[in-house]
Amino acid sequence: MTVAVGSRLGPYEIISAIGAGGMGEVYKARDPRLDRIVAVKVLPASLSENPAFRQRFEREARAISKLSHPHICTVHDVGNEAGVEYLVMEFLEGETLADRIAKGPLPLDQVLRYGIEISDALEKAHRQGVVHRDLKPANAILTKSGIKLVDFGLAKMDVPALSSVVSSLSVVPTQADMGLTAQGTILGTFHYMAPEQLEGGEADGRTDIFALGLLLYEMATG
């Protein structure tokens, strides 16, 4: 669902569009209560009508809200306005790791620094039962304070109730967005999937480690 610039979602004033991904559109917004700039992620209307997608959106909010780490994007709020589901996150300024890699290989000291920061963030998430499932350069933002992992849109709380939701979904790929999770799609982004994801198996912390290895390789080689 496209949200008009200047409109509101709950208390949040929409300033501009940032981009779009598998789980919806992202906007730059302002929280007038705290005079704070935030990022608001909106679930598409076509998906918000689907109970499975709404449940996944809420799962994303729960997963991220439990993670407090300097290299994981902070979630501030989640809400529903006139049937529109939205997630309010920390607004990050900086280029994506994908944009940086496109310019060529990173210096070795930066590769090591970012690798350590991502590893530390993943360890925190995994210890709390959260698997990112879609780790890739586009989901890492280079800020002044270091790298930040974003878009836990494919995150899975490692508990039976939520695992059953994921395992009940089909894993046959479509030509549409490979980041979507629904009947007829794979969880993840094709080029960064671990073998178990491609085979339709369950993902765990090792799945993220596989993707991290690819990130390190791309950072070092460009």
Can you describe what each PLM-predicted range is?
Residues M1-G222:
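Conserved ATP-binding/catalytic core of the eukaryotic-like protein kinase fold
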